[in-house]
Amino acid sequence: MCNLTISRYRIKFKANQNIQLPEYAGSSLRGAFGHALKNIACLTAGLNKGHCKCQPVESCLYRRIFDPAKQKLILQDRLQDVAPPFVIEAHSLSTKVLAGQEAYFYMTLVGDFAHNQQMMIQMAWQRALAVGIGSYHNTGQAQSQLVSFELCDRPQLNWQTSENLRVQFLSHARIQHHGE
């Protein structure tokens, strides 16, 4: 029997100033989270103008969480992208969050490694929300503050080991190809 650890967290924040988000805020949140995580978890980014130069890349906590290294496919002579062990759901966010308002979004962590780094992930969100999300966030003051990082769902997935596995994803993702 295999176990896959999946947990969904509700991240609530309070705006200290007006926040303008794009219509699809997921990529803005992902970018803010990635920058904050790199600043606190990558040992080489601060010395290389924000670029991760860790070698091997698997040794970098930032890369393992946010930008996993490609892996060689078994029985094939090519590399395959590896999805990061998280999903950000921003469908609940409005495009405007006014100063003093609270808002929330969700983050789902997948796998034991991501769960073992939950404290680092929470710290990265705290920093990302303070530095700013969305447009116009370079004011020098904390744009918003983390109110809570709460577990809201932890499904129990158990299955027998098999050669065939079918996974169906339901996503709020907005997929574009060449800008369309």
Model segments located where?
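RNA-interacting cores
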Residues: 1-180
